[in-house]
Amino acid sequence: MNCYFEEGETFTWIRDRDRKDKNLIISLRMLKEKHRSGNKQAMIAEDIRTGKKYFVKVLFCTDLEQVYVEKESKVQLYSPYVIRIYGGILDEKKRRFITLVEYIEENDLSDLVRTHGLAGSTWNEKMKVCHTIALKILYGIDHYMSMYWQDPIVHRDLKPENILASPDGETVKIIDFDWVHLHDSNVTVMLRREQKGTPGYADPRYWNSYICRKEMDIYSAGLVLYFLYTGRHHFYGNEELQRYMVGDDYAYELKDMPGIDEPLKRIIAKMIAREEERYGDIREVIADMEAYLKEIGRMPKLPELLREENTRDTIRFSYKVGDVKYSPYVKNYRFIPIEFGRKQERSQNGRMSGHILSFYRVGDEMRSVILQEDCHKIKEKERGRVREGDIYSYAGTEIEVLQIKKVR
């Protein structure tokens, strides 16, 4: 019998069970149940001390080890267009895995487009919002895919219901990484041979296979953009879905989009084409979308965007975690994740887990974003920038920046 949370119930969230520091413990009060079915539950909760709200996802499963390996709690990265996932803990006694997620008070794209409506009183105003939302979705995909160059993260369930957006397009967040393929994980490929994604949005070629490729998300994103610009699902009704599942030409041909410019249609058509004719990289999609929007004078300004123009220069970024030194090369926009409890961590401060800090490049500068609230910058040469000699501290381990050198 599953032990569901009830409204009003309290729960103590411990980020690291090996340490009992006060700032690692959050006392949560369950405010409202959002979903309950079978082995899943979703709640809105608040920090009793600060009042900060969180979204709590609960998964009940007999195979606790598999849940711990696979859960979306491992997808911890900073992006203005990807939901913040704070981490997950395993409640062995009640056989449930609990994931703490950023809480956003916005509708999903399906509800927004079909029920509440986009901001704007004219067609052009609504198209402006559509362009902004579309770009942010594409940038969000680029952000999680660019986390690792080899074997990138793949969402595998992109659809309108898994994107939160405000009516004006100011807020856009990709959510629900339940089906995610994690970097360097055979588990998410081999043990999840069952269907991946949602009928009508997942590439039918990979519907029931061991293969996991980033082109899967490009296909799904194309169908999401079709919905955004038309207000209709590309494949609708049992008959169309059955034809789509066959995986023949019908699944890869764009339907008509009345009122939409031909260049934009061509972009979306190439996103959902057969893989050999499809975009091979999300940045190719972004480049074509940006070129189209600049051509028509509709390129939105996104001040929070952490992406720069391509450059031939590379930055050699050296740092050490504890006594172990790392020297990755950083070109253009790329995250350097600092993780504990995985291959990278070699300190002797006990068992720790999670992605606690990211470094990234903007132009010729390196910057950082702290993802765990108990990670602190204890030595800083210049506020808001990363400089040689800067030191971060987490669980008694220091992360020191050794070198930032521009090379060609």
Kindly give the residue locations of the regions a language model identified.
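ATP-binding glycine-rich loop module of kinase domains
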Residues: G38-V67
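Short beta-strand micro-motifs within the conserved protein kinase catalytic domain, predominantly
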Residues: R84-F97
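Conserved short submotifs of the Hanks-type protein kinase catalytic core
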Residues: K94-D108, L112
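Catalytic-loop of the protein kinase fold
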Residues: M145-S166
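Conserved activation segment of eukaryotic-like protein kinases, specifically the C-terminal portion
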Residues: M190-Y206
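Conserved end of the kinase activation segment
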Residues: R205-E215
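Terminal C-lobe "cap" of eukaryotic-type protein kinase domains
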Residues: R274-E277, R283-M299
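Forkhead-associated
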Residues: S327-E398, Q403
